[in-house]
A protein has these predicted regions:
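Anionic-ligand binding patches
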Residues: 2-4, 11-18, 22-209
């Protein structure tokens, strides 16, 4: 089966392609479609699953092929609703933040609460045809909980500002200081959650054929 992953991010596509390799799926991304006109999508859902559904419906209706989309949100324990990022990790009070602005904002939030414990919640929505749709936002897809602090790591990487403030709970290290093996543990757990979702969906789909 040829399946479209609704992303233009090659790193995300490669990671998912590797994880789903044993399922007999030929995974392609948006950039593989060449000059095919793609829909404009307004991601205004209140949860990652709502946004994933909006995206997958738009792609399926426009491209008429099996497709899935993912979305994520950042959620902290024990914070006021107004301080909960959710799906608006980079947008605060309607403003899209730069890396530096994000670092300042979340450092101040961590200072306000004396440190924060958070996790990324991930969702996926899959449409195989007009009659077969599968959605999930399961705990198995969540990142491991981590600590967010108010003191930034001296190093910064473009596009990953929150890693400057994030502490791995297993090791007590900033994310930037994790070695490759340590950093891979959480990613593998998240990928396993997605693999289980696709295994269940494909098994159910083939039973109904």
């Amino acid at each position: 089966m040829k399946l479209l992953y609704g992303t233009g991010n090659p790193a995300k596509l490669d990671a998912m392609r590797h994880r789903l390799a044993g399922l007999g799926i030929e995974l392609i991304g948006l950039k593989d479609l060449g000059g095919v006109k793609q829909p404009e999508i307004i991601e205004d859902g209140k949860t990652p699953l709502e946004n994933a559904r909006k995206k997958v419906e738009a792609y399926f209706n426009a491209l008429h092929m099996p497709v899935f989309s993912c979305d994520s949100g950042l959620y902290f324990d024990n914070v006021a609703e107004d301080d909960q990022p959710g799906v608006h990790v980079r947008t605060v009070n309607g403003k899209y933040l730069s890396d530096e602005e994000m670092t300042v904002h979340y450092a101040a939030l961590a200072e306000k609460y004396g440190g924060l414990t958070g996790r990324y919640k991930n969702a996926v929505s899959l449409i195989l045809d007009a009659d077969h749709r599968y959605d999930a936002m399961d705990p198995s897809m969540e990142s491991a909980p981590f600590r967010m602090v108010s003191t930034p790591h001296p190093m910064s990487k473009k596009g990953f500002p929150l890693d400057r403030l994030s502490i791995d709970l297993r090791t007590g290290k900033y994310y930037y200081d994790l070695n490759e093996q340590e950093a891979a543990l959480d990613q593998l757990a998240v990928e396993d959650g997605f693999l289980q979702f696709f295994e269940r969906a494909m098994e159910e789909y083939h039973k109904m054929e």
